[in-house]
Amino acid sequence: MSKIIGIDLGTTNSCVAVMEGGEPVVITNSEGARTTPSVVSFQANGERLVGQVAKRQAITNPEKTIMSIKRHMGTDYKVNIDGKDYTPQEISAMILQKLKADAEAYLGEKVTEAVITVPAYFNDAERQATKDAGRIAGLDVKRIINEPTAASLAYGLDKMDSAHKILVYDLGGGTFDVSILDLGDGVFEVVSTNGDARLGGDDFDQRIIDYIAEDFKAQNGIDLRQDKMALQRLKEAAEKAKIELSSSTQTLINLPFITADATGPKHIDMTLTRAKFNELTHDLVERTIDIMKEALKSGNVSLNDIDKVILVGGSTRIPAVQEAVKNFTGKEPSKGVNPDECVAMGAAIQAGVLTGDVKDVLLLDVTPLTLGIETLGGVATPLIERNTTIPARKSQIFSTAADNQTSVEIHVVQGERQMAADNKTLGRFTLSGIAPAPRGIPQIEVAFDIDANGIVKVSATDKATGKEANITITASTNLSDAEIDKAVKEAEQFAEEDKKRKEAIEVKNNAEQIVYQTEKTLNELGDKVSAEEKSEIEAKIEEVKKVKDGDDIEAIKKAMEDLTQAFYKISEKLYQQNGGAQGEGFDPNNMGGANAGTGAANSNDDNVVDADFEVQDDK
């Protein structure tokens, strides 16, 4: 049975893990890192970059570099690149494709199934959008699970014998969640959850950006936030400063030539202290404490009941966050799990449960928001209360609001407000064919089904006639099957184009290498090669040089093959002249470097890649 991978699709960074030998293992990416920046960029030549390479060029290509797309999941937001609109699902799919490819390279087999995590406070539209992104990336998403729940799995896998009540504080790049769980005897049961899908490390960065920009504006009269390239430099500087302030009490922000005016170039050279950073972000930290209070209250849990506090998400490395959590809970947060990796590890454990690799683990999650319908007067009538264990099914009998009413519109809402208009609309559908009768007489059963992924289905049945209507909630911001299929085809086409582009680069690199090595060896051999032979080789070299920068890969391969064969004849002759001993330290098999010769021309060695090395000045 093929592996099911676990993916933490994060706002700023993503991570992928898999079960091996009964333990979750984080998979390193092609750059050798254990997490991958959730960044996508589009190049002028049509190439797409994902991850660290995309983040690295963001300053020089800010308009075509997309970050924090997760914040727009489940909305109608679109990114326009070169006249083409991309949905958040499509951009997220590009990140998932990168993670999928890294997992396949690590496992040595094709990966088609995944468990993907989402913030606990993601609504139905955001969860659907995540599933769509997986589908576009070529992944069958077997389960969507909440990030704090996944983290608790990673924390509790080796602690299943004793009962614990744990509080998971998950502050990521773009979202914040708190979950309280009962853990014991292999059962992970979520007691309550609360959160804010628009609160995270990005907001802490933004406070630093605004502070720097306002200070610069006061001194120079220029708002750097209006300059996209300058703003991108500010973003990188803010993130770097935030990270440095986790281990230092102050940091230097130095941005030379940030902009210019009539008086000349302008620079930023300022010091930011941890105390000032704490002052700038105090209300954000307090907001997380308020959400913790709400989670405890809705779960009817006191702080004395909590045995352990787990910190999840890179933003929990901020000292003020750690201090606030410690002061509020009265407990030292557990450092037993890596905040950047534990969510992906938990997803891998859930994948292991689905494949049978992990035994005796039962995950009981909850729905984060109340589900209901609009009734007379615009009231939101709840059917499934928040923090109900899922999967769940609830039904209730309703009736008509007018005499002889033959149809009813069911307006499905999600949220905690009393009035339907104040909550999020998940969908509307109509039940027709109701037998005419005075108001209040017809009996219409409305049933809500919510599956283990948190995806909602609603049905309405006229008890008298048996007529039924139903809807699987797919918000207007989600993609239709046709749109998903189109995006899947585009993603597959791009993957094939990317493969061809990579092959072309490798062949051209090999051509450069074989030309260099051949010319070098010819010079070293000197008079040992006749003028006629030298002329023939030089002609072959010129042929490779002529075609190597073109687009005809087959022509480059043929020219390389011709050069290799011609030089091989000379090397064989020299070999015989030296009585079977390799002369002058010359090895014809190595003349083109590790990847040259006919093998390179045919790209037989998939394990060998050329690398570009960038020389940087010492800072």
From Swiss-Prot:
Q: Where is the composition biased (Low complexity)?
A: 589-606
List the Pfam families hit by this protein, alphabetically: HSP70 (PF00012)
Question: Which parts form a coiled-coil structure per UniProt?
Answer: none
Question: What's the superkingdom here?
Answer: Bacteria
Question: Where in the sequence is Phosphothreonine found?
Answer: 175
Keyword terms: ATP-binding, Chaperone, Nucleotide-binding, Phosphoprotein, Stress response
Question: Which GO molecular function terms does the record list?
Answer: ATP binding; ATP-dependent protein folding chaperone; unfolded protein binding
Give residue spans, biased composition: Acidic residues. Answer: 607-619
InterPro entries the UniProt entry points to: ATPase_NBD, Chaperone_DnaK, Heat_shock_70_CS, HSP70_C_sf, HSP70_peptide-bd_sf, Hsp_70_fam
UniProt region (Disordered), positions on chain: 578-619
* Secretion signal, residue range per the UniProt entry: none
Description of what induces expression: By stress conditions e.g. heat shock.
**Which PROSITE patterns is this protein grouped with?**
HSP70_1, HSP70_2, HSP70_3
For this protein, the record's NCBIfam families field holds: PRK00290.1, prok_dnaK
Q: Which family does it belong to?
A: Belongs to the heat shock protein 70 family.
Summarize the protein's role. Answer: Acts as a chaperone.
Write the protein's name: Chaperone protein DnaK
The record's gene field reads: dnaK
